[in-house]
């Protein structure tokens, strides 16, 4: 089969690397891709949200399967675009439809889903510009630190954790009235602060069967010793040392199963990867957020541990035969470290040449 991967990051490079090893993948394309993917596949210079141009290339290259890396095209309805176009109806898309993608596209939607299905998460309330005064009153009744989250997509920057009440009120006003995060902060979710250690859980589902991938933990802060501002992720490890068999069973029983059952009860079709951001509070798991795709940089430590042919698993998703597959992964550890330009995550230079890479490196550099 011919496969198109949509995206341009390290996550998509890892998908490309893994699918290049697949016995069922004939030709591999990435849109728009990057310098790394160009070594393994054909890059197509198309933006991830340019659905019409993507359609043209899918038909021209006789692509059978599309794997969506980032969240933007999913929230914008790329799966629905393929599903509703007679020319593309035969092309399978690994990634949920627009309705399900709201689990990441709207934090309020996700929180309502969790509460409705008894999935453990932080207490919360949602506010709009019209209910700013109620938002102030809600903050006054909370114990600091105060957690403010832009409802929509904000490129991973829409979460503020603030110690001071007056500062929290000021930021709430900025978000709701001044639009400090643009459209994303037209609604703001204020959450109870959860004190614990975070981890990431990954599921692949065809809407009926599902497989649980190795769990991972990413490290977001820019500086040594977990200091400095948050980033998209400076590194990740898998497996996670503090996930015991007992704790893993709690995740499956209290979070994974109720989530998948919730999709069925709410009549939400879900096909693709589901990334559940968790926090371990004491000995209990709670959900911080849902993401409707694989994580970056977590993909870079999860897929190298996977012993299965990824192409076979994704074909099973397309054919809704995932129940027939069993997952197998190496009993080893994987670590990834992210190299970034100076100044990141603020203003930084782009387009610099990366030198000194070993193409035959056993460490996958």
Describe these PLM feature segments.
Residues 4-5, 90, 103-187, 241-257:
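Active-site nucleotide/adenylate-binding loops and adjacent lid/helix of ATP-dependent enzymes
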Residues 5, 30-31, 67-68, 93-96, ...:
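General beta-strand structural signal in soluble alpha/beta enzymes
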Residues 38-40, 102-107, 223-224:
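Short, charged, surface-exposed secondary-structure boundary motifs
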């Amino acid at each position: 089969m011919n496969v198109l991967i949509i995206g341009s990051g390290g996550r998509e490079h890892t998908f490309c690397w893994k699918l290049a090893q697949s016995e069922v993948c004939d030709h591999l394309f990435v849109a728009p891709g990057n310098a790394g993917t160009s070594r393994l596949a054909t890059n197509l210079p198309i933006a991830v949200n340019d659905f019409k141009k993507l359609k043209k290339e899918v038909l021209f290259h006789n692509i059978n399967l599309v794997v969506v890396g980032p969240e933007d095209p999913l929230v914008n309805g790329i799966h629905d675009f393929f599903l509703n176009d007679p020319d593309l109806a035969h092309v399978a898309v690994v990634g949920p439809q627009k309705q399900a993608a709201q689990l990441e596209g709207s934090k309020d939607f996700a929180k309502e889903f969790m509460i409705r299905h008894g999935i453990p998460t932080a207490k919360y309330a949602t506010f709009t510009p019209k209910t700013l005064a109620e938002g102030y009153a809600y903050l006054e009744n909370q114990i600091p630190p105060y957690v403010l989250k832009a409802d929509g997509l904000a490129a991973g920057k829409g979460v503020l954790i603030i110690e001071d009440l007056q500062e929290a009120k000021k930021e709430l006003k900025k978000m709701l009235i001044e639009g400090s995060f643009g459209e994303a902060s037209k609604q703001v979710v204020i959450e109870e602060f959860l004190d614990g250690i975070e981890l990431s859980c990954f599921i692949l589902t065809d809407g009926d069967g599902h497989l649980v991938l190795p769990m991972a933990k990413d490290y977001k802060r820019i500086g040594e010793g977990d200091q400095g501002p948050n980033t998209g992720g400076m590194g990740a490890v898998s497996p996670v040392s503090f996930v015991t068999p007992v704790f893993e069973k709690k995740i499956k029983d209290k979070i994974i199963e109720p989530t998948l059952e919730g999709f069925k009860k709410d009549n939400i079709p879900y096909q693709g990867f589901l990334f559940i951001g968790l926090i371990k509070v004491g000995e209990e798991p709670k959900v911080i957020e849902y993401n409707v795709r694989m994580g970056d940089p977590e993909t870079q430590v999860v897929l190298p541990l996977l012993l299965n042919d990824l192409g076979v698993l994704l074909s099973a998703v397309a054919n809704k035969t995932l129940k027939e597959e069993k997952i197998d992964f190496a009993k080893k550890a994987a670590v990834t470290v992210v190299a970034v330009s100076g100044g990141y995550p603020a203003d930084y230079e782009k387009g610099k040449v990366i030198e000194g890479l070993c193409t035959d490196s056993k460490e996958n550099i």
